Amino acid sequence: MEEKPVVAIWGAGRCNDLDLEMLAPYVRFVLIDRTMEDIQAARARYGLSEAQCVCVDLRFWEIYEEEERFFETLLANGDDLHLSEYLRQVMESVAEQQPTFAGYEKAFDFSVVCGLASQLNARFAGLLQLYGKDLRRLPRTAAMMKEMNVQAAGRLMDAIMVTTSGAVF
């Protein structure tokens, strides 16, 4: 029996914009997201077994809700220096974490990534918008958010290259 290629979908979430059922006869899936409940719900919705569809959080860019909530509390009275310094600390903390991909080195034949890099730090940007903060008036914070996005995209690409043996889409 021929082995089906393994397709990893990075930032899969609930797969609301994907039709896994259409590809299921031809491939095996690995759904990657930091919210396990979402990717498990997607697998269940499509009626895929664990052999057909593995759900995993590779933890390559770990920012926790507590850090996001603390940033939200800073927004009330925090100035540009304090906001940017906090984001720098978060970024350094994440950068110090060395993700391990034990068991996943070159495990995927193909990786599919759409817009994930921009989502990795999106909550911080969303909070600034929610609180009516103008990034033009917060140049240090804007610069730090840009640097966080560069770091997140780099970490994502490193993870993809370690785990993918074939093409990246």
What are the residue ranges of the model-derived segments?
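A structural motif corresponding to the C-terminal end of an alpha-helix
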Residues: 152-169
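A conserved beta-strand element that flanks and buttresses the S-adenosyl-L-methionine
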Residues: 112
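Short beta-strand element of Class I
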Residues: 28-32
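Conserved SAM/SAH-binding beta-strand->alpha-helix loop
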Residues: 35-36
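S-adenosyl-L-methionine
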Residues: 45-105
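Conserved SAM-binding loop of SAM-dependent methyltransferases across substrates and taxa
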Residues: 13-26
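Conserved class I S-adenosyl-L-methionine
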Residues: 3-15
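Mobile active-site "lid"/loop adjacent to the S-adenosyl-L-methionine
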Residues: 85-90, 95-103, 119-155
